[in-house]
Structures are given as structure tokens and as C-alpha cells.
């Protein structure tokens, strides 16, 4: 997880939370993935920051269509620099 979130990440998370609280309840449960795309987006932004987190979120949203089966699709783990081989 990013040690401190950038202003951009905080704004994007705030927008996603607004969607979760204001729009999503009106649409009902539709997401074919676990976690939902909005939860995925927040986790990706917190874990990877604004640029990579946004990219992962956009890729996830583009998979959300009737031809994709959905299912479990967690945010990928960060590569741990301590485990790299020299």
C-alpha cells in the first residue's frame, strides 16, 4: 500500500465513494466481479497510487461486459523489492 496517498488518488477515491453512495444504490447489484469494480478501484489506488491504480481500474471496467464471465478478480499484489534476486 502506498505510504501516503497523493491528492489525485484521494480525489479519485472520493469520486468512487460518491458513486458508491449516490449512484450504485439506484442501479442495484450489477457487478459481475468480486470485489466490485468500485471496491477494486479504491484498493488499486491505495495500493499502487494514482497512475497505476487508475490504469488497473480502467482495465477492470473495460472487462465488465456481458461477454466476460466475471468472477473473482482481486487487485494484484505489489512486487516486494525485498524479495528480488540479485
Swiss-Prot record:
Q: Where is this region: Disordered?
A: 66-86
- Which Pfam families does the record associate with it? YidD (PF01809)
- Subcellular localization, per the record? Cell inner membrane
Entry coiled-coil feature ranges: none
Where is this protein chiefly located? membrane
Task: Report the domain of life of the source organism.
Answer: Bacteria
Q: Which UniProt keywords apply?
A: Cell inner membrane, Cell membrane, Membrane
What cellular component GO annotations does this protein have?
A: plasma membrane
Membrane topology of the entry: Peripheral membrane protein
Q: What does this protein do?
A: Could be involved in insertion of integral membrane proteins into the membrane.
Give the similarity note: Belongs to the UPF0161 family.
Question: Which HAMAP family does the UniProt record give?
Answer: UPF0161_YidD (MF_00386)
Name used for this protein in its record? Putative membrane protein insertion efficiency factor
Amino acid at each position: 500500500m502506498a505510504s501516503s496517498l497523493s491528492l489525485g488518488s484521494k480525489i479519485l477515491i472520493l469520486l468512487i465513494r460518491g458513486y458508491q453512495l449516490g449512484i450504485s444504490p439506484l442501479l442495484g447489484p450489477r457487478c459481475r466481479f468480486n470485489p466490485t469494480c468500485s471496491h477494486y478501484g479504491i484498493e488499486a489506488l491505495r495500493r499502487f497510487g494514482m497512475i497505476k491504480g487508475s490504469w488497473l481500474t480502467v482495465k477492470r471496467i473495460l472487462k465488465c461486459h456481458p461477454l466476460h464471465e466475471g468472477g473473482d478478480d482481486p487487485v494484484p499484489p505489489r512486487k516486494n523489492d525485498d524479495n528480488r534476486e540479485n
